[in-house]
Amino acid sequence: MKLSTALVLGATATGAWSYAIPQLEQEVLELPETHYEQQEKYLIELSPYQTRWVTEEEKWALKLDGVNFIDITEDRNYGLFPTLDAGSYVNYPQKMGYVDTVKGLIAGLSMDNMRKDLENFTSFHTRYYKSSSGVESAQWLYDQVSKVVRDSGADKFGATVQKFDHSWGQFSIIARIPGLSKKTVVLGAHQDSINLFLPSFLGAPGADDDGSGTVTILEALRGLLKSDIVAHGQSPNTIEFHWYSAEEGGMLGSQAIFSKYKKNQADVKAMLQQDMTGYVQGTKHAGQKESIGVMTDFVDPALTSFLKNTIVTYCAIPFVETKCGYACSDHTSASKYGYPSAMATESTMENSNKHIHTTDDKISYLSFDHMLEHAKLTLGFAYELAFAAL
């Protein structure tokens, strides 16, 4: 996830951000002629249809300045936020229909599981998507997801866990729990982390960004598969859990997945992204009530309304509306390819974790009680839509 930060390098972009593009031009010095290897450049989009070619170093400079972007180099000809097809509008339930069942499943969610998983997940030096340890962490996560599915017995009824390979090394992960139709509900988080100062060398435990979201939806998957109806493939709709690679590089992994889904005409009815689910200190220091942040910009309004209803029904804390700006996480990719998306996070943006993208994004700053509330909403969201007439 991209957040504003005070950790700004001298070479970062400057200028206010209100859909104005920070200037990256540098003074040209007269130096002796020297032949340099040309740096690879990437096409990024900083707001709808506002693009720029940048080097990788310029990418990180923008992120340090709190500037969001999506890297569209691989699919630059696809229009962003296209008009949904006439038949693709989704009517989400106006009220929850399976409260007793979902609350029974919620009772089985475990903070101990999330803590253990996050301790292991943050033990890798970095989960930077181009690093060898980023591949190792992805393999560890794949093994955990596979074990959850096997232990539930869902694999005997068609459930699968697949690696979605990418050119940069770290793969994305897709757990698919088939239903009676191909109408699909996606729950997502990103698995990569980054240290913006020297991504290839410095540590990036990424406990909150987005280790917290990763283990939150993993625990929700455990809880969901305790339903025999779901595990046995008898829910009306299909449920998928995604762990995306390379979100920090500009939503690269999620774009690749939703691009393929669009080409294959996948019938995705809803996508919920969970990015940073564990930090509450900022909210408490501000003297505000602990809440779940619900994004209201660049999301689907109807799905966001359903998300709010889910929180009110299944969580012990309220929601608070907030905005993260353009291209702040992987729900952007779902929207880009015409799929309805929503996003939940730990707080309002101004109260969110400022330790991210450094070596200091540690478990010690996080609240597993708060992460449990996010797991509750994830489980409720998934189960209710698994049985909804979408």
UniProtKB/Swiss-Prot annotation:
Propeptide feature: residues: 19-90
Cofactor stoichiometry and binding remark: Binds 2 Zn(2+) ions per subunit.
Ribosomal protein listed as a keyword: no
Disulphide connectivity of cysteines: 324-328
Q: What class of enzyme is it?
A: hydrolase
Q: What GO annotations for molecular function exist for this entry?
A: aminopeptidase activity; metal ion binding; metalloexopeptidase activity
Q: How does it assemble?
A: Monomer.
Q: Which family does it belong to?
A: Belongs to the peptidase M28 family. M28E subfamily.
How is this protein named in the record?
Answer: Leucine aminopeptidase 1
Gene name on record? lap1
